[in-house]
Design a protein with these regions (language model features):
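Extended active-site neighborhood of metal-dependent phosphoesterases/phosphodiesterases
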Residues: 55-113
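N-terminal active-site segment of His-dependent metallophosphoesterases
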Residues: 1-58, 63
Length: 113
């Protein structure tokens, strides 16, 4: 059986207007290029402010598409908003169906393998 190599990343918080975070992602991309995993999983917060800036999600998706390995995503609170809790204040960006649909639409774009 061959070895399956997985790289997990998270909290990239990407936005075109935040060059330092983009620079960080490029360093991560260089490491992924050097190690060539079979799959990359971003476990949330791809974008800096997906609920109010769809372009943040689109920018994040473009950078992830350029990775030298297939990539899958899980949504984080910076991507679709927060769920309310019983103990804390209400979220400033609650999860909405529209935010979830925007995220799903970006995920449905074909992935290159």
């Amino acid at each position: 059986m061959s070895e399956f190599r997985l790289t997990q990343i998270s909290d990239t918080h990407l936005a075109r207007r935040l060059s330092k975070l983009t620079d960080n992602f490029h360093r991560v991309s260089e490491r992924i290029d050097a190690t060539r995993p079979d799959l990359v999983v971003n476990s949330g917060d791809l974008a800096f402010d997906g609920p109010t800036h769809r372009d943040d999600l689109e920018f994040a998706r473009t950078l992830h598409d350029a990775l030298p390995a297939p990539c899958r995503y899980l949504p984080g609170n910076h991507d679709i908003g927060d769920n309310p809790t019983q103990v804390g204040p209400p979220p400033s960006q609650p999860v909405t169906e529209q935010n979830q649909q925007t995220y799903r639409d970006l995920r449905r774009r074909p992935l290159a393998f």
